[in-house]
Amino acid sequence: RAFRHLRGTPDFLLFPHRLLTMLFLRLLPLILCFSGLVHAEHRVFTRKDGFLSMRDKLNVYFFRSDTHRLLVRDEGSVKTPRYGSLDKAMRKSPCVAGVNGGFFSADAEGTPLGLVVQDGKRLSPLATGSFAVSGVVYEGGRDGLTLIRSSVLRRMRRLPAMQAAIQGGPFLVENGSAVKGLNAQKSTYRTFIATDGGRRWCIGVSSSLTLKELAAWLAAPGALGNFRVETALNLDGGSSSAFWCHETGISYPAFKQVRNYLGVAPVERR
């Protein structure tokens, strides 16, 4: 219909219009991405320090808190899990992406080490006094999606209303800068959640890195494209790290059974 007024026009005169249309459609995803209109997407970032070094990789899923929400899916037990894997847990939920969740103990049940809230129900209490559970990411209440220090929640008389919550740590980035004093010796797979301080968020997993290396990477200007990391929290990693994305069909399972998962789902419109 757009070319109806050109009926009868020679093909060679129509060609520029068609070429421009095709070019626009090819560039549309990039235009939307850089304009911030894309609400959710999966991207892969790589870097290489030296000629003989391994290529480091980040699998990251970006989303907005005004269009998407966090869901927690708990296995109930690592011995007799309800789902058995991140992939199965996400597919049985309205999630478009997900990662493994918080730390858990080595007992038969895999008791969570820190706060866990699923569908508004608190499954595990807030933990205190540990570097590994220094932060909480939660969904719900007046502030919507929030990443906060555990010590701040601890000082509250009552915890805010939460639909979903996972406790983790340590913080990797605060106020846009890499946190100092992070471990620089142990390299392993890492899982994290980050925000730009506004409505833009991401979850991700990394190749084998130290906490210090991951923090420095996330805090570096342009490390995640036009997403500037204001705050980032480490979640359970190592053999627990897992990443799943419905859009791209990517599924990186954990090497062992984990206790819970953190998923991203579209906001339910009423």
Regions picked out by a protein language model, each given a short descriptive name:
Residues 22-30:
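Sec-dependent signal peptide recognition
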Residues 4-6, 12-13:
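Short hydrophobic targeting helices and cationic amphipathic motifs
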